[in-house]
Every structure is written in C-alpha cells, then in structure tokens.
Amino acid sequence: MKPLVALVGRPNVGKSTLFNRLLGHRRAIVDDTPGVTRDRNYALINRFEKPFILIDTGGFEPVTEDRLLQQMREQSSLAMEEADVIIFMMDARSGLTPADVEVANMLRRVKKPVMYVVNKVDGEKLENDSAEFYSLGVENLYTISAEHNRGVYDLMDDLLELLPLDSGPESGEEITRIAVVGRPNVGKSSLVNRLLGFERVVANPTAGTTRDSVDTLFMCNKKPYLLIDTAGIRRKGKTTEKLEKYSVVDALRSIERADVVLVVLDATQGVTEQDERIAGYVHEAGRACVFVLNKWDAIEKDNSTFGLYVDKVRTGFKYLAYAPIVFVSAMTGQRTAKVMESVDEVMEQFSRRVTTSDLNRVFSEATSSHHAPLAHGRRVKFYFATQVTTRPPCFVVFTNQPDSIHFSYERYLINQFREAFGFNGTPLRIIFRGREKNSPSRRPVKDS
C-alpha cells in the first residue's frame, strides 16, 4: 500500500483546491459553499518522486449539533486514523478560529507527523497576519495559496521527506475499479458502506447528500479494488444548482474511469426513465455492468415476484440484457455478498481474450449457418476475425462490405461470440473492416 496523506481542517479552508492542485486536474468539487466535500475522497498522486495516496475530507467541526456536520467530522477522524501524514489546513482570510485551536489540540495527541498549513495567503498583508497561527505552539508553519500555487512545492518537498516507504501490492497486481451509479437516494452510499463494512460514505435520507465521486481503496478476498461512489445522476433539466451540475459531470466521468459499473435501482419504484438514461451512459461507455436492485426487503413477495422483477429489468434495459441482476437490501445486508461475486465474474469476462483459431472456428460456423443479408444487391463475404482488445473485448471482422453490414447481423455475431466463449456479463464490440490491398490474399470463410 502506498503511504496515505490526509487533508483535514474546517469547512471551506481550501482542502479540495489543494487536492486538485496536487492531483494536476479538478477531481474534487470546489465551491465557496462550506461543506461541498462531504466524504473522504482518495486519489493516487504520482507526479512527484514518491507516489502517495491523498485523502480529501469534509470539513471538521469539533463541536456541532448538525447531523451532517457530525458525519463529516467522523469521516475526517477516520481519515486521520488511516493516514501516515496529516496536513492540517487553516484559512488566512478567516484568521485563527476557536475551531482551529480545538483541532490543533486534538492533533497533538496523534502519534504521526502533522504539517500545519495556512492557506489563502494571497498577499503581503495576509502573509504578515498569518503569524498569529504560531500561537498554536507549532515550530513549522507553511503559508501557501493553493489556488495560485504559491508555496505548494516547498510544502511538497517536506511532505515527501516524511512519507514512509511504499508497502504496496505485489508487482503486476491490478486494481478493479468499480463505479456505483444511480438516481439520487436509491441507496448507493448505503450499499458502499455495506460492502466496505463500515460507514465510509455519508448516508443521509436527503437526496444529493453525496456530491463528489468518492474513491475508496479496499481489499476483498485478498484482492484490491477501487470503489467509486458517485453523486446521483439527475435529469439535465433538474440540475439547476451549480454544484449539482458539477456532480453529474463527475458521475459520468466516474463511469469512464471504471471497469465495472454497479447500476443501483430502487425496487420500490421500479425502472424509471432516468434509470434507463443512466444505464445508457454505461452502455455507451462500454463498461461491464451489474444491476443491483436495492431495497428488496421492502417488497412483498410470492412465488412469482422474483421473475416479475427480472422481466421488468430485462424489458427496461434491452441493450444490457447480458448484465447480471443482484437483489439486495443495503440496509439489512441481505445478499450484498453476491455483489462482489458478480463483480469478479463480469471483470473476468471483461478482461477475457480468446485465441484467433477458436474465434474463427466459431465465426465460420456462425456465418455458415446464417448468411448476412445482401448489401446493395451484392453478396457479403467474410474473411476472418481477430480479437484486438479487452476491457471490453473488441473484435475486428474482415469483409468485402465493411460499411454495409446490417446492425441485426452484427448483433447476431455478438450473441454467437457471447454464447460460445461465455461473455455473459460484458459488452462486446465488433468493427467491420475491409481487406487492405497489400495484405496477403485470404479466402472467404467457407459457405458464407
């Protein structure tokens, strides 16, 4: 495991701005509204001599009656427990506050390196005023402007000296990236917390509690995973608030980053138009998919209930008919272990490669038993097929009519490959290509 560095401090002191600065691009949502970052957000920072994992946290308020702020404080405390080094950030514009003093007193009891940072030092006056922070009794105080990149590299030089050696996973071990997506308030964060075994993400009945896409590294059955809990995706017309628009874009980017996407559905509401839209994003991105039908405990059941709900999902998502369906209750934990089993199964298929000889055997049988429709009155000839990539598996089929293959025949070939090679939980892609004139002569597949 690479060393962990936690950013902690009051709300709106610039933790997410520094997080994005060190990452090299915007990942955490940055806004003037306090409490925009509500959970622990992880990112691998590999732009410096020593790679490390940076944890961005929600604001830390030592004393509060607000339940959401209490949950954010708990998330910050967990981040401090996980971290090898803590960066405690304060705000030069606000000056030293009683909350800063409370956090500093708590950090004195932490037996790990703490770096005290005053952010938003954007001019000489603020530089002079920041001297008051020395009253905390610290020897080294870093004055920076994360927004303008002032003092950040000096901070990084000293941080790298404090980092322990990487005790990371064995070489060659790959991390499966899992995105959790769905409409607001279908139970995504509750599912994440259930899978991880502790409250990793702020789960709240209020729709939109998760605003950032929150990354969590974890181990399951001795295998590493990166779990991405996304903000709920709403209809475009309903994302009027600026932060909501940021979050939807971030959720779509999370789908692009993932290997496997868990599409969480609410069993009590059935399949909605917005569910179909979200699943469409997953399909277009070409990611492996598992449908997680949550709140199954709230459904009254008889012998036909299971089959009826399977039919509802299959009817609503015809283009994802290959994706497995898991019925769970994130609240009670019912069948949630099946989720990771399904992730492993579809990931194996998502990464599977078949030999060219086996592929062409199936390809020849498929084109011989069912001929392609004529294209512009001409017979379609197929020459051979080869797999060019995985994740998702992609095949190139060479033919004399690459631009005239009917989509129904493409679907037929995909289904033949799926059945023959066990690609039951992953999208498949076929590219039709003409023979290059300079390539060796090849005979068409027999009887096609």
Curated annotation (Swiss-Prot):
MF GO annotations: GTP binding; ribosome binding
Keyword field: GTP-binding, Nucleotide-binding, Repeat, Ribosome biogenesis
Residues that bind GTP 2: 182-189, 229-233, 294-297
Keyword Repeat on entry: yes
Domain of life: Bacteria
EngA-type G domain ranges (all copies): 3-167, 176-351
Protein name (database record): GTPase Der
Gene field: der
